[in-house]
Amino acid sequence: MKSFLLLFCLAQLCSCRSIPLDPIAGYKEPACDDPDTEQAALAAVDYINKHLPRGYKHTLNQIDSVKVWPRRPTGEVYDIEIDTLETTCHVLDPTPLVNCSVRQQTEHAVEGDCDIHVLKQDGQFSVLFTKCDSSPDSAEDVRKLCPDCPLLAPLNNSQVVHAAEVALATFNAQNNGSYFQLVEISRAQFVPLPGSVSVEFAVAATDCIAKEVVDPTKCNLLAEKQYGFCKGSVIQKALGGEDVTVTCTLFQTQPVIPQPQPEGAEAGAPSAVPDAAVPDAAVPAPSAAGLPVGSVVAGPSVVAVPLPLHRAHYDLRHTFSGVASVESASGEAFHVGKTPIVGQPSVPGGPVHLCPGRIRYFKI
């Protein structure tokens, strides 16, 4: 009898290690820092960075909440809310995210907020749904930390556009290889001391030689795309003229990848998605002369949408507006229902809900 009681107690202890399913609400609530929860969140961040057409990569900062729903016939879906922070790596930069630095608060940091559904099936995580938005830290908070730190400037500001153009012209003048075109202006700030414009922008190589270019409009992007990322500064001299400094990092060329065509599509038919909507094509600089183009992930495709003209950063909502991804088309559709207003089930000891999770960097 004692042996039976001992076995019974051991069984109860083992069962306490698993997260109970709420028999009324129909979901589990693991801790936000649970390993599987974190893996689901990291899978979502990876998905976000792979589908961003412009701007900078984001990294996980905090998991705010999580519910795990069963999914028929197999698997389970993590319904997670996460906070992200912008890094200093551009989306075209092949540097692994783990090696990318988080942009600090004194540099006018940008935070993202995402609601995501991630399917876990056979030990693999795949993203079903992503809805995000992002915003820079408030000017007041930046000023509290650093009164003299520059704030983000509108990317279509005439001084910003001029700074990007002269910085790129300076780079091309110093370059003995390909002529580079502007892909996008990614970030800009007005620096008070010394009075200057700081600008960051992405570029792409063309089939022209930099030293021989007469008409840049006749230059075409290379079939095997080569991108670069530049940082420039333009200081207006008191007696006229400018001091221009620029440094560019060029990335390895990207091989041509055949794009799958829809059934029945003609070989020469134009794509429904403009080249400017995807990362492997040059887009015009965001200036007052032409409305910038963004994109929304809609299932297996990327759909072009207009961007706000006076934006200072690339808002995640312009890509992740809450459209289910292609993975959700397989198997039974998953719909998160409204959470019933019920008490917690009578689980011995009561479940411990450790949410929100730890902050990996800082809150803004």
UniProtKB/Swiss-Prot annotation:
Biological processes annotated in GO: acute-phase response; negative regulation of bone mineralization; positive regulation of phagocytosis; regulation of inflammatory response
Residue stretches making up the Cystatin fetuin-A-type domain: 27-133, 144-256
One Pfam assignment: Cystatin
Modified residues (Phosphoserine): S134, S135, S138, S321, S325, S328, S330
Residues carrying sugar: N99, N156, N176, S301, T339
PTM notes: Phosphorylated by FAM20C in the extracellular medium.
Residues spanning the signal sequence: 1-15
Intrachain disulfide bonds: C32-C355, C89-C100, C114-C132, C146-C149, C208-C219, C230-C248
Keyword Signal attributed: yes
Example GO molecular function: cysteine-type endopeptidase inhibitor activity
Source organism superkingdom: Eukaryota
Keywords: Disulfide bond, Glycoprotein, Phosphoprotein, Repeat, Secreted, Signal
Compartments, as annotated in UniProt: Secreted
Modified residues (Phosphothreonine): T319
GO CC, alphabetical: blood microparticle; extracellular matrix
Keyword field contains Ribosomal protein: no
PANTHER family: ALPHA-2-HS-GLYCOPROTEIN, FETUIN
Family: Belongs to the fetuin family.
The name this protein goes by in its record: Alpha-2-HS-glycoprotein
Organism name: Ovis aries
